[in-house]
UniProtKB/Swiss-Prot annotation:
Family: Belongs to the class-II aminoacyl-tRNA synthetase family.
Binding site for Zn(2+): C336, H387, H513
Position of the signal peptide: none
Reaction catalysed by this enzyme: tRNA(Thr) + L-threonine + ATP = L-threonyl-tRNA(Thr) + AMP + diphosphate + H(+)
Organism lineage: Bacteria, Pseudomonadati, Pseudomonadota, Gammaproteobacteria, Lysobacterales
Cofactor binding, per record: Binds 1 zinc ion per subunit.
HAMAP family: Thr_tRNA_synth
A single GO BP: threonyl-tRNA aminoacylation
Protein name (record): Threonine--tRNA ligase
GO annotation, cellular component aspect: cytosol
Pfam families the record matches: HGTP_anticodon, TGS, tRNA-synt_2b, tRNA_SAD
Cell location: Cytoplasm
Enzyme class: ligase
Record gene name: thrS
Amino acid sequence: MPMITITLPDGSRREFDAPVSVMQVAQSIGAGLAKATIAGQVDGQLVDASDLIEHDASLRIITAKDAEGVEIIRHSCAHLVGHAVKQLYPDVKMVIGPVIAEGFYYDIYSERPFTPEDMAAIEQRMQQLIAQDYDVIKKVTPRAEVIEVFAQRGEEYKLRLIEDMSDDITAMGLYYHQEYVDMCRGPHVPNTRFLKAFKLTRISGAYWRGDAKNEQLQRIYGTAWADKKQLDAYILRMEEADKRDHRKIGKAQDLFHLQEEAPGLVFWHPKGWSLWQVVEQYMRKVYRDSGYGEVRCPQILDVSLWQKSGHWDNYQDAMFFTESEKRTYAVKPMNCPGHVQVFNQGLHSYRDLPIRYGEFGACHRNEPSGALHGILRVRGFTQDDGHVFCLESQIEAEVTAFHQQALAVYTAFGFDDIQIKIALRPEKRLGDDATWDKAEAALRSALGVCGVEWQELPGEGAFYGPKIEYHLKDAIGRTWQLGTMQVDFMMPGRLGAEYVDEHSQKKHPVMLHRAIVGSMERFIGILIEHHAGAFPAWLAPVQVVVANITDAQAEYVDSVRKTLANQGFRVSADLRNEKIGYKIREHTLQRVPYLLVVGDREKENGAVAVRTRSGEDLGTMTVSAFIERLQAEQAA
């Protein structure tokens, strides 16, 4: 038998006279590497450390220092959850346990909901199992035998999952954690010693196949890392994120609430709506300064329009419907078809293009209830939506201009770490490959002109076109996807949008879909968490509170409030019969940027004592001097 040559990342080669496992190659290099080996990447494909290499191949040893290694640790921790749960609660049924961002979860069918006490017991059992330092054994098993294994164990959900698999899959990996067995593509860790840096984080409900009509499952979430240092850093980040939770701050500052009777829909309170209006007016100015005409389109449209647009075939599961007089209408999930209708009212010359429309468009999408999360993931939301109807030759200039607008907006709201990505054609899409090639090339060209680097995301574009995505990093290092710019060669033709070219021929324009903040609800939720409720003064729902020390200053306090309000500031007066120290503490906790304290001396001198929310005493100044200070701060 010819020798098998293994090529390592540094270009060095090792030869073996028989099929060799990843672990054996690692052992041939050194005992330290072998001990650290989690898996391997053979010719670009991740495999288990026990898998045999039977031909010449390139090999990269995967350890906990690699991103792939950490992901494998997380996946194996999900299996360890299964092992612990089945020992503690033998009657439950295991469903599925995937890796997610920074962690993992396992869905489990249980007759009763798990409690926090259950989660603590499961975590303790997992730690006990890890301490046993046992090997995780992989066995590639014929499909029929896999069915038999899970049938004997009464794991009906595993059997359903196997039933869903293609007939081409004739064998699969079974991973044994002692007496517990799970099926998976793998790879997994070779031993439980790699799983020490984990923590279970929460329990929630989920539905089989994500459908609320199906039975409810228990979902156990956890996180896992390469070592305790990384785990501790993550826990600190999560504790900080918990302090910044927009739901907690929203309640504490009386900004908004949600309730069961309206899942995924927001009740805005006066201060929250004030914050909304500041954001909206800022974005309205962006529309005006960028040459967008603001429009307003209907909330519901006959389904025939959604059939023409392509939403019916590609998006109807996420749409709400209603009926009237034997006609079916859809509540709009997107604003684009409405903007095409505005464009279609009248004849356009190529000289008129580009034509830009903007709308603070209220949309509704039928998100699964389990996916809803505060105001970050809702069913009813408003977008700073815009559409540009242009010539192909104008795409680059429009995308470049949008890029500059978007960066300026993000900077103004306090974000300066921005990553740019291009989401490419999805499997389910409109149009042919040539059209998609053209659209994707246009976005690459425009970003090239902007001189920025970007990452490409295959399969993540919208069904009607590729898109540029703007991903913003917040104050604690989390990344949020916000703005988008999409090139669409399809929808104008489907909805009859036309212009007359220089040869008097009717042509379909290119349609650019753009949003900078995206969902206003989500953006405000992100702002709350990014600033931890301590908004910059220009953005704060209440910029100034004027507080008296005794009733003798009440009239003067009210006159100061009116003076500030007349200058356009968002100001309130605190005339309660409370000690001034109490008032200061309360408004500081409310993150109000400025507190103006008024006693007899300030009243006599027509002045105010100025304090910031950080506790800094700026001293006594005239009301006009304070106004100048606040105006200068807002203009900065």
